[in-house]
């Protein structure tokens, strides 16, 4: 009998690019940007032309994974489309990429460092007007 580890499916390898490479891919190569932060985080500032599909929701019990995440992404992107995925620090977006790759999305890239690194580099963002 073959060892059981030979039958395990290893998770797809997530390709992570730094924020400078991500900016180039979005600005010059025309890749679309998927922001997986919460709607509240996204509303405080985001990359221009980004699409927001939260990977997690904040509930009274803490963070809970969005059960419709892959379905919602599939309504916005084709499985062949090249997409840069980002969050606040690069952790949720990496998990999101794992789920998307497992669902058959072929060309997703994680933005390492996330929105925080984007801001640290002084790259352009869309900040909604503050009320009050």
Regions inferred by a protein language model and the residue ranges of each:
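Rhodanese-like catalytic fold shared by cysteine-dependent sulfurtransferases
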Residues: 1-31, 39-84, 91-132
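Conserved P-loop
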Residues: 35
């Amino acid at each position: 009998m073959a060892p059981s580890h030979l039958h395990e499916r290893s998770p797809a390898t997530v390709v992570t690019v730094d924020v400078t490479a991500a900016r180039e891919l979005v600005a010059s190569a025309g890749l679309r940007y998927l922001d997986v932060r919460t709607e509240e985080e996204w509303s405080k500032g985001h990359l221009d032309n980004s699409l927001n599909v939260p990977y997690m929701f904040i509930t009274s019990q803490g963070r809970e994974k969005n059960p419709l995440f892959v379905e919602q992404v599939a309504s916005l992107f084709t499985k062949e489309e090249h997409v840069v995925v980002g969050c606040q620090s690069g952790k949720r977006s990496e998990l999101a990429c794992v789920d998307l790759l497992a669902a058959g999305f072929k060309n997703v890239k994680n933005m390492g460092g996330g929105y925080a690194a984007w801001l640290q580099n002084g790259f352009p963002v869309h900040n909604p007007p503050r009320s009050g």
